[in-house]
Amino acid sequence: MAICRILGIDPGSRITGYGIIDVRGTAIDYVDSGCIRLATQLMPQRLMTIHQGIFELVQQYHPQQFAIEAIFVHKNPNSALKLGQARGVAICAAVLSGLSINEYAAKSIKQAVVGKGGADKIQVQHMVKILLNRQGAIQSDAADALAVAITHAHHLQTLACQRPRQTDYWVNGNAS
């Protein structure tokens, strides 16, 4: 059975989390996770750091799929603009690497991982550890990125279940 490697991204203007998983059928295996920390650089340098970080992850791990948290309405317009810029350069790095973009709303991610769209960060972190059989602590932003990747894995598994099997064609009397 083929392995599909997914790179999940939790974008941020100060910290961008990443999570990499392998999917084989219904099995999901942890590969790596972490954070691209952006310190106190000016915004253009932060954006360049995000772009380079994502590009390097793609070069090192060779994912076949890319998933990112979709934009949400933020109370602070300035923060929303910065988050949009961070997402934009992450998406740009993925597209330039030949990956298609898969976006998931925060509520959908929480629903897929925890079972309820209103889950908090601690619940998401806990379920990510359980689903990926991890013992040690996972950084919050990295756990969120792994949750994005897990959500995409569930989406791919659902699509695979909906495809008609080749044998269905023959069983249903379609052979001539």
Swiss-Prot record:
PANTHER family: CROSSOVER JUNCTION ENDODEOXYRIBONUCLEASE RUVC. Its EC number is 3.1.21.10. The RuvA-RuvB-RuvC complex processes Holliday junction (HJ) DNA during genetic recombination and DNA repair. Endonuclease that resolves HJ intermediates. Cleaves cruciform DNA by making single-stranded nicks across the HJ at symmetrical positions within the homologous arms, yielding a 5'-phosphate and a 3'-hydroxyl group; requires a central core of homology in the junction. The consensus cleavage sequence is 5'-(A/T)TT(C/G)-3'. Cleavage occurs on the 3'-side of the TT dinucleotide at the point of strand exchange. One of its GO terms (biological process) is DNA repair. CDD domains: RuvC. It is an enzyme of class 3 (hydrolase). This is Crossover junction endodeoxyribonuclease RuvC. Mg(2+) 2 binds at residue 69. Mg(2+) 1 binds at residues 10, 141. Keywords: Cytoplasm, DNA damage, DNA recombination, DNA repair, DNA-binding, Endonuclease, Hydrolase, Magnesium, Metal-binding, Nuclease. Its cofactor is Mg(2+). Its main location: cytoplasm. It catalyses: Endonucleolytic cleavage at a junction such as a reciprocal single-stranded crossover between two homologous DNA duplexes (Holliday junction). Binds 2 Mg(2+) ion per subunit. The active site is at 10, 69, 141.
